[in-house]
């Protein structure tokens, strides 16, 4: 499931090298934390949240096959100063 999220998000964003997905396992729930650059957050969320909702729908369908519950959270990275 982690690979699925990375594959989809890297295809959408301008900075695919900055996409990072962390998996936190619970008893029956898996939480995925998605980190992208601040410039890419809008692209991942999409107009009226349609893009992130579509990704979450795919994630939930995949998790349901394994009798699990999955959640996807977007964590914004801080701007890196040079």
Specify the residue positions occupied by each region the protein language model found.
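RNA-contacting regions in translation and RNA-metabolism proteins
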Residues: 1-41, 51-53, 58-82
């Amino acid at each position: 499931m982690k690979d699925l999220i990375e594959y989809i998000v890297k295809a959408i964003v301008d900075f695919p090298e900055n996409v990072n997905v962390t998996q936190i396992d619970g008893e029956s729930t898996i939480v995925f934390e998605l980190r992208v650059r601040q410039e890419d957050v809008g692209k991942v969320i999409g107009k009226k949240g349609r893009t992130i909702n579509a990704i979450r729908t795919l994630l939930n369908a995949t998790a349901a096959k394994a009798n699990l519950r999955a959640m996807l959270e977007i964590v914004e990275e801080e701007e890196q100063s040079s």
